[in-house]
Amino acid sequence: MAPPTGSAPASPTPRGSRLRWDLGAEQIRSAAAQLVARTRQVYDAVGALERREVSEQNTLRALAAAELDYTVQRNMLDFPQHVSPSREVRSASTEADKQLSEFDVETSMRQDVYQRITWLQEKLDGASLKPEAKRYLERLVKLGQRSGLHLSREVQEVRRRLSASDWAKSPSRARTRGRTVPGREAAQAAFKEVRPLWGLGGGEPDLWGGGRGWAAHIVSSLPQKIKEIKKKLSVLCIDFSKNLNEDATFLAFTREELGGLPEDFLSSLEKAEEGGGKLKVTLKYPHYFPLMKKCHVPETRKRMEERFNSRCKEENCRILQQLVELRAQKSALLGFETHAAFVLEMNMAKECKTVAAFLDDLAAKLKPLGEKERAVILGLKQRECEQRALPFDGRINAWDMRYYMNQVEETQYSVDQNLLKEFFPMQVVTDGLLGIYQELLGLTFRREEDAQAWHEDVQLYTVQDPASGETLGQFYLDLYPREGKYGHAACFGLQPGCLLPDGSRLTAVAAMVANFTKPTQEAPSLLQHDEVETYFHEFGHVMHQLCSQADFAMFSGTHVERDFVEAPSQMLENWVWEKVPLQRMARHYKTGEHIPSELLEKLIRSRQANTGLFNLRQIVLAKVDQALHRQPKADPAEEYARLCQEVLGVPATPGTNMPATFGHLAGGYDAQYYGYLWSEVYSMDMFYTRFKQEGVMSPKVGLDYRNCILRPGGSVDAVEMLLQFLGRPPTQDAFLESKGLAVGPGSLPSAC
């Protein structure tokens, strides 16, 4: 694609990037081993310091410098598994990811390093540290505690109390004397205090059957047990995601079986080897979603939906069960009732009951709307079945949802998505999007010609702040699908924008990876409007990565509370529903004409279409996630089916196992999928309070947004960012109105 109009000339190499993408499989393996050795040396040096020797420079700054180097190199080695066209390189990258994940666990469990960090905290008492350095030190201590490294003191206390009791000194004699033994109650009290640390249930334990040292041995071995679990978890998460990325399942259909799909879609499909004029349809997004929205053959949609929600069913179902059980074990060892409780401690929500109340309250508000929408869909289905002489089963099936939701847009809002996409060719959308972001955030983007990347389709841009002349970083755009590539849309932070040890700033680097329809000889890549929305969303994450100006790598970019991380990019989705921005990124791919005003107005009104069902499905996914991480024995498929019926009112297809395809469960969103809805409360408040009131293209508001929300990264709490940008505590009103709901009291989040 061409650079946006008015772009500055390209420079040959990006400033500050430490990344390279020409590594072969053996080079990746070798570099991973070297990175581990180099980083371990730093940790060994810190761990060997005497108490009197620890200082900000040789402890805090040394660890920060090692973390920065490790983060950049690790990203360079494990990112290729998601994007490399070479299976060998992807495999080596996955191996490196597993090796480095194991090392991550090792470093997180360094008792010696944790001890030096706590010594430093006691020594400095925060007085001599800058605010972000103090936050970094406190976070290191907190992460150590969340790995159980603080338990050594409890271990010593338990040992002292157990050894002091007569019961512990002579268990065989004590058993014959029953409850009359002096010290027995003290020993039992000690046991009850530490029991949650190793996850034992209630009741009278056979604490002493193995001898005096048994209980103390269990407690002292906790860090090692936690370490083992964390290593297993990291490998399982990698395997879960890899299985989905590498899945190459396809179905073969005749043109008749694909009835209703446009010619440009059909002509883009490969022919199936089995012959008979059949076409290959994969389970990747660019094939799955268009088919589910437009194919009027129910049996075709049914086959696709069944296979899509059965991807990697056997292997990922086993992995998922292990994940939830191991997470529960680890959290119990650390004294948490559930894994969800462990995770939420670091989020805005803080507690499971807060999340449950939020989801229940929103579901109750949305259910009446969902019932109305289901009635409309059922009516559309009955009418179509009569017109096409198809049997009407009187129900909405999972494979009916997207098809009839699309029909709602077409019939009730007169929005023809096939016609609309002709106005969204990739080149025009990209130029418009980049122009809008530049104007809004006060930035300039320059495309780098002949830049090194992992595939010829990938393009690189440099981002500068014209006000200061500073280069903030670079971003890659990898927008089209290919075999073995990450199957969804996501932003990958590759190099943190933060301070180097010498005080200079390392520029940030990020990649947006997506799977939009590839161009053909007959037509360019044409985007559905929801794909334009996805583009805006993920690019919002890119801007978060590049605009943050944290001092430490740990706080760079999107390293904020997980239930706030989506808010900045969700807020920017609003621009694809506003008239002026839409006109800037939409022109007919043949005539160059803008979207007709009438069609544009219909599109904007259609934002309310299906909002009840869409958000109820989000609640289903969030509740499944919460259920699995609060009740690890729950069956994922059964839990999903139950919630689909109870919350959404649409049954899951028997035999499928959607949770086995739910990448978020292994991708860092465990017990946190609720965050998509939770974040939207804040994103809508930010948009309607500032941009809608002062101008959606206001450079002043855009700069405030960049400085208050994007610039801090995770160096301050999200609550503080929101207060600074909004000028008041956030409210839920804009969120409820955006869903077509009445504004009123409820259990939606209040950050302050």
Predicted regions and their residues:
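N-terminal helix-rich structural modules
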Residues: 1-178, 183, 187-191, 202-203, ...
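Divalent metal-coordination and catalytic microenvironments
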Residues: 28, 152, 219, 335, ...
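Active-site-proximal, well-structured secondary-structure segments within enzyme catalytic domains
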Residues: 132, 136, 202-203, 209, ...
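A conserved hydrophobic secondary-structure block that centers on an alpha-helix together
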Residues: 148-159, 215-226, 310-322, 329, ...
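Catalytic Zn2+-binding segment of zinc metalloproteases
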Residues: 336-337, 540-552
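Active-site recognition of the HExxH zinc-binding catalytic motif
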Residues: 527-546, 569, 680
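C-terminal substrate/ligand-recognition segments
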Residues: 536, 613-631, 651, 655, ...
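C-terminal amphipathic alpha-helical interaction region
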Residues: 695-752
